[in-house]
Amino acid sequence: GGGGGWAAQAGGQVDMGVFATGESNNQAGSVNIATNGAIQTAGVNSTGILAQSVGGGGGFLGINTANDYRMLLGSSSSEGSNSSFDVSVDNKGAITTNGNNSAALIAQSIGGGGGSASINWKETDDQDGKASTPPLLLGGVDSKTANSGNITVTNQSSLITTGLASPALLIQTIAGGGGAIQSLDDAYAGIIEF
């Protein structure tokens, strides 16, 4: 509801969320997922299951770039309410991921907040040749109200990940807050706000 979405392989400025929406209200719906079969993925940023209820928030952002950029994942300058609802996942099949930044299962209820970001940047500083980091903003800014829902996850099978920064299970209910950032690079700290 008035939220972001999913982006990958992006360069330059990247903004996902709600900006200067005045008195608008951003309401997301409930999410219900039931799986019975096996799921297997390969490659970077290849999550097995991603279940999100996002109201005025972010989404999922996967970046693999050699360019500098700014990332804003969340809501900004909204006088209305940002509300997400319940997320339910019932998984009965084995999930296997074989790439970096590839969780087996992510469940998030986000109201005016952030989301999940996987970042792999290669921008270097001309002065010392070391990697530099872009400004990152993950979360809600100046939102009037932010409410997130409940999350229920029932897992009856194996969750296997083989890559770096690839949790088997990530569960978050976020109201006007942050989210999750994963980076594989030996980069120096930039501006990170939650």
Region spans (language model):
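Low-complexity, glycine- and small/polar-enriched segments
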Residues: G1-F194
